[in-house]
């Protein structure tokens, strides 16, 4: 093989290998920071992974909020109209957090199916519902439009 051709081949191989390593490292780094969204029905059915950090959301079930008297621990249930999942959180809840309103939680699902939240986000006005929650509500209750704001939701399920 001619020396110039050999040098060109080595340069191309180096670029291909370096690019492959760079892409692999980026995919690895991004996968660690990826929080996928799961509605309560997918969490209860086991579709949501146990252990890694995920996001979940739905409407806070009225009457389900229980606050500890001696700490900042709070437990409540969220529903998508099909299933409900228990959420445990320790910390201050957002000012707009309320029963019957949409919430998105970030955390891990335990082996028992309890969502251990590290962050709770509440909708920030009466007409806004997080897109993930809105889509989950539409899918779970035959696309009924009033579900976007958690009104008229059958919380008995």
Swiss-Prot record:
Keywords: Cell inner membrane, Cell membrane, Cytochrome c-type biogenesis, Heme, Iron, Membrane, Metal-binding, Signal-anchor, Transmembrane, Transmembrane helix
UniProt protein name: Cytochrome c-type biogenesis protein CcmE
Function, in words: Heme chaperone required for the biogenesis of c-type cytochromes. Transiently binds heme delivered by CcmC and transfers the heme to apo-cytochromes in a process facilitated by CcmF and CcmH.
Membrane topology designation: Single-pass type II membrane protein
A single MF term (Gene Ontology): metal ion binding
Family per record: Belongs to the CcmE/CycJ family.
Disulphide bridges, residue numbers: none
Keyword Cell membrane: yes
Cytoplasmic side: 1-8
Binding site for heme: 124, 128
Parts of the chain on the Periplasmic side: 30-157
Record field: transmembrane: 9-29
Gene Ontology BP term (one): cytochrome complex assembly
């Amino acid at each position: 093989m001619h020396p110039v051709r050999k040098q060109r081949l080595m340069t191309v191989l180096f670029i291909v290998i370096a690019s492959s390593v760079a892409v692999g490292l980026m995919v690895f780094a991004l996968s660690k920071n990826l929080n996928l969204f799961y509605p309560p029905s997918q969490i209860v059915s086991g579709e949501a992974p146990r252990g890694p950090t995920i996001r979940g959301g739905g409407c806070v079930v009225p009457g389900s909020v229980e606050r500890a008297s001696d700490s900042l621990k709070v437990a409540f249930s969220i529903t998508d109209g099909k299933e409900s999942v228990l959420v445990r959180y320790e910390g201050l809840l957002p000012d707009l957090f309320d029963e019957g309103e949409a919430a998105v939680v970030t955390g891990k699902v335990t082996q028992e199916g309890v969502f251990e939240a590290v962050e709770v986000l509440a909708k920030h006005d009466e007409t806004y519902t997080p897109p993930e929650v809105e889509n989950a509500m539409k899918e779970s209750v035959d696309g009924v439009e009033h579900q976007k704001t958690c009104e008229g939701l059958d919380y008995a399920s």
